[in-house]
Amino acid sequence: MNNLDLSLYLVTNNSEDEEKFLNIIEESLKGGVSVVQLREKKAETLDFYNLALKVKEITQKYNVPLIINDRIDIALAIDADGVHVGQSDMPAKTARSMIGEDKILGVSAANIKEAKKAQRESADYIGVGAVYPTNTKDDATSVPKKELKEIVKSVDIPVVAIGGITQENAHELNDCGIDGLSVVSAIMEAKNPKIASENLLKEFKAKNS
């Protein structure tokens, strides 16, 4: 997938207050978020489907790709831009055969072996983490900075770092060679999602200037 801007990659969290949830996404897009991944691990299928349609309406307005976490059925049903799968989700190779060559396929990896396998199975990018402690995912594997650098060097596809990234620590990843910052709480729980997005993007752009 060419020209995929992964600079600031938003992964959503729980959407209990739908109006607030959709507003956060829109504000983050105004602040420069370049990809949105809709992640709903507990939602009923119909609720997820309806929410995904609403989120897609917003992302299309800003010409930003919408990725669905894990649920290939939802991604296909709403014609999302792609799917992201973890190590315990549908195998990447199977996901690719289901979504076709034109959709974006992202894969989570926590080590070089997983990253290389994802590349072989035609992933368009890899999400590596958790680079910092995170409350979003209880079972997240910790990936030291040294390991992150080695993963980046081991593959030819883009890598985004995820896990506990904030405006305060993002600069610590400056020399890792990553293609983007993937965040959840730093935007979803920010008082001002637009400004939070702008600041995170500034941190990332600063290291790439």
Curated annotation (Swiss-Prot):
Pfam families: TMP-TENI. 2-[(2R,5Z)-2-carboxy-4-methylthiazol-5(2H)-ylidene]ethyl phosphate binds at T134, N135, T136, G164, V184, S185. It comes from Methanobrevibacter smithii (strain ATCC 35061 / DSM 861 / OCM 144 / PS). This is Thiamine-phosphate synthase. Pathway: Cofactor biosynthesis; thiamine diphosphate biosynthesis; thiamine phosphate from 4-amino-2-methyl-5-diphosphomethylpyrimidine and 4-methyl-5-(2-phosphoethyl)-thiazole: step 1/1. CDD domains: TMP_TenI. Condenses 4-methyl-5-(beta-hydroxyethyl)thiazole monophosphate (THZ-P) and 2-methyl-4-amino-5-hydroxymethyl pyrimidine pyrophosphate (HMP-PP) to form thiamine monophosphate (TMP). Disulfide bonds: none annotated. Mg(2+) binds at D70, D89. Its EC number is 2.5.1.3.
